[in-house]
Amino acid sequence: TRETRCSLDFIAKYSKKMSQRNITGTQAAAYLLKVNGITDVKLGRIKGNLTDHFSPSEKVLRLSDSTFDSTSIAAIGVAAHETGHAIQHAKKYFPLTFRNMLVPVANIGSSAGPWLAILGIAMSFPILTDIGILLFAGSVAFYVITLPVEFNASNRARKILEQNNILSAEELKGVKKVLSAAA
């Protein structure tokens, strides 16, 4: 979509702009975890581009190849966004907890739900139709809940980057665009 292209354009643009303080995405994430009192989350690397994520079950914040060693404004923004998820987890942010509980339902519901509903209709078996619809509704709920969780992580990232003077005022303008794209 047009919005996705625009988001990726911002990330690409700010991936070419290096931070004045020459801090890598990994260094930014480590520092932000530390100043937020989060000592039980490990940092790891994951192959790919924009494959960054926080795994609450493993307590690992994984940064992609394009973020890990990069000193770009985009890398710092993406790393801070993922750190925002670690902060959400540490503070027991309910929408994140609820979303994580929906992951198994969303995985099953998005793939099996529609098929069960169709099969239930075809076989005149209403309970199967209802189960399919409920499973699919669970996957829809997951995606609806994901948006506020992502926006909250980006808002947390913006605030902690500002509070800790990791980026200059000019760089913060760019990182805000990256964080909107990350959400």
Segments from the language model and where they lie:
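Polar-ligand-bearing catalytic/cofactor-coordination segments
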Residues: T4-N107, A141-A183
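Post-HExxH zinc-binding segment in Zn-dependent metallohydrolases
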Residues: L102-F125
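Hydrophobic alpha-helical segments of small multi-pass membrane proteins
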Residues: N107-S110, I133-V140
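Hydrophobic alpha-helical transmembrane segments
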Residues: F125-L135
